[in-house]
Swiss-Prot record:
One of its GO terms (biological process) is dUDP biosynthetic process. Gene3D superfamilies: P-loop containing nucleotide triphosphate hydrolases. This is Probable thymidylate kinase. ATP binds at residues 7-14. It catalyses: dTMP + ATP = dTDP + ADP.
Length: 196
């Protein structure tokens, strides 16, 4: 089982990914939480660059990093019976790079050639103004965190949501967001159980 947690910077992905892992463990699943970009040399280059790279360079680095992550972490965990929760996955790639002009369908196709499709994607949707305020409280803003750009990214996330995606309003207080996510996970697990 592969669950992706997506959203713009400051949406609460890391907190909610950890919460989903707790919920799944309570239900008896072995769980791994993985974060992207990963720790490959390509992921490190994305994280360490002070300035934005060109959209094409960014896409290439994300794809190379994800290919390694899929081969070395995601697929082996799934094959060993783990439920994998992704703190960011390729929908981030689709949203962030299509907001800079690359065709969203092309990005999706390139990603789906190298990485497994999630069974469920939880899109934490939040107004960019709220998200940026949360990020500011954490410390330094990255080059990815500019208001106009995040508005475009949010729009791209919503426009490119697919049949695996459930949109959750992440502007609410954390306990309310968690409660909504818990309902989504329970409904997903029930559907999964009934389809087996």
């Amino acid at each position: 089982m592969l669950i992706a947690v997506e959203g713009i910077d400051g949406a609460g992905k890391t907190t909610i990914a950890a919460y989903i892992a707790e919920l799944l463990k309570e239900k008896g699943y072995k769980v791994k939480v993985l974060k992207e970009p990963g720790d490959s040399k390509f992921g490190k280059k994305i994280k360490s660059s002070e300035e934005r790279l060109s959209p094409e360079e960014e896409l290439e680095l994300f794809l190379k990093d994800r290919e390694i992550d899929a081969r070395e972490n995601i697929l082996p965990a799934l094959q060993s019976g783990y439920a994998v929760v992704m703190d960011r996955y390729y929908f981030s790639n689709i949203a962030y790079q299509s907001a800079r002009g690359i065709d969203a369908r092309l990005i999706r196709e390139m990603n789906e050639k190298i990485a497994p499709k999630p069974d469920l994607t939880i899109l934490l949707d939040v107004e960019p103004e709220i998200a940026l305020e949360r990020v500011r409280k954490r410390g330094k803003l990255s080059p990815f965190e500019k208001l106009d750009y995040l508005r475009k990214v949010r729009k791209c996330f919503l426009e490119n949501a697919d049949e695996t995606t459930v949109v959750v309003d992440a502007s609410k207080p954390l306990e309310e967001v968690k409660e909504e996510v818990r309902k989504v996970i329970e409904s997903f697990l029930n559907l999964k159980k009934n389809s087996n």
